Regions:
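N-terminal intrinsically disordered, cationic/polar leader segments
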Residues: 1-136
Length: 136
């Protein structure tokens, strides 16, 4: 009796640092009772992004040493950074949405992609400006 197995491989690149200077301002956010947040200037949009790709197309790399379908993890990092440079949106969620579509459109061998992002808070520091302290 033979048993057929279905395998799926997943791998990726974690903690890709992303810094987008002067991203589009986030404005017009309706406040909710729990928060007074209505937007931010986005002088610096900073985050860490994790990429995990999966699918059956990567099996040959593990069973036959055939890496033709593998997307190198450094290529994943470079792909994230390249798309951050041209990102015109205001939120990390929007960036991850666009990035996920771009991964799937660019690399046909990827069946699924999981993206996780952690936004890093940026608070402007006070710096001397014409004899007084102002926001950096």
């Amino acid at each position: 009796m033979s048993t057929e197995y279905n395998y799926e491989i997943s791998y990726g690149k974690m903690c890709i640092p992303l810094y987008r200077v002067y991203a589009a301002p986030l404005t017009g956010v309706a406040p909710i009772p729990e928060s007074a947040f209505t937007g931010r200037e986005n002088t610096l949009l900073a985050a860490e992004v994790d990429v995990e790709v999966s699918g059956g197309n990567f099996i040959a790399a593990y069973t036959h040493g055939d890496n033709r379908n593998i997307v190198a993890t450094d290529s994943m990092k470079n792909f994230v950074l390249k798309h951050a440079l041209t990102f015109e949106g205001s939120t990390l969620e929007e960036f991850l949405h666009l990035l996920g579509h771009a991964f799937l459109a660019t690399y046909a061998q990827i069946e699924r992609v999981r993206l996780t992002g952690r936004e890093l808070a940026f608070t402007a520091a006070s710096v001397p400006q014409r004899g007084v302290f102002g926001a950096s």
